[in-house]
Amino acid sequence: MILILADSLRYDFAVRYLKGVFPEESWSSFEAIETFTAPVLATVATGTPPEVHGVKWFTDEVNPDACKDTLFDHFDSWVTISRLIGNGPKWLPPSRRDNLNFLPPIRWNAVTNNDDDVLEYVGRKWSIATNEWWDLIFYHSWLTHGPWGVDCYGPKELPCIKNCDRLMARMTKEELHKWYKIGVDDFKTRLMAFKNISNNLETVIVFADHGEALKDEGGATGHFKGGHHIADLAKVPIWINRRETIPDDINHVTLKDWVIKMYKKYELDNSEYQEYKEKICRK
C-alpha cells in the first residue's frame, strides 16, 4: 500500500486535474482537523485528535498513551518518505536542529527527506531484481506545498526565501493559481508512475492535510493554524484507486482505521498480490 499525504492539496484542484489517473477510483472529502501539518500527521498516525495526542507544533512530542496502537503497528514493514520527517537536512531552522526525532515516540521509520526518492522505493519494491518489500510506503508529498506557507522558516533562518511571503502577497490570484497548478501537474505525474510501476496492483490512498489559500477568499495566501474560516484551507480531498465506498464519517481521526481495513481487504486478502510478494521475498 502507498498512503499519500499530499501537503496543501486543494479539493477543487484535485477533482479538476487529478481525477482519472487510475482505472478505478472512489472520491470523497472532509474538513481538516487543523490547517497546518504537524497535528494532522500526529492524528493520522495515532487515530486520535489533537486534544488527545497533544501536538500543537512541529517540535512537540506525542502523548505516549496515544502511541500504544499507531497506524504502523498494523504493518509488518513500512517506510516513511517526508521532507519533514526524514534525515534532518542542514537547512532546518534552529528550532528543529535539536529535535531530529520528529513527533516522538511515533516510529516513522523515515528513510529520506527527498521527495523524489519515493520513486526509488516504489521501484525497488516492485522490481524482480530485488527482494525488498514494504507493506506500507507512507509518502508525505510536498509537490503542492508552497514555501510561502512555511512560517517557521522565516527570514532569519532561511535568507534565500526571505521575500516569499511578500512575493506571494503581491501576486495576483491568476498568478498564484498558475504556479500552484504546476505542483498539481507534477503530483499527477507521480501518481501515474505509481500506477505503472505496480501495474495498479498497489493500493493507493491519497488525502491532504489541509488546502491552500490562493486569494480566492480575500487576500490570504498559503496556510496557517486556525484557518478553518477559509473554505479552500479547510476542505480536503481523499480518494483510493479502487471501487470502494468511502465512509461518510471519514476524517483525519477515522482515517487510520479505514486505511488498515483497506490494506486487509485489497492486499492481505488479495491472492494475486500475496503471490507476487511471496515470490519477491523468497529470492
Over which residues does each language-model region extend?
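Short loop segments at secondary-structure junctions
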Residues: T48-P49, N241-I246
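Active-site-proximal alpha/beta segments of enzymes that process anionic O-linked groups
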Residues: L3, S8-W133, W142-W148, W258-R282
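Histidine-centered active-site microenvironments of extracellular/periplasmic hydrolases
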Residues: L201-T203, F207-R243
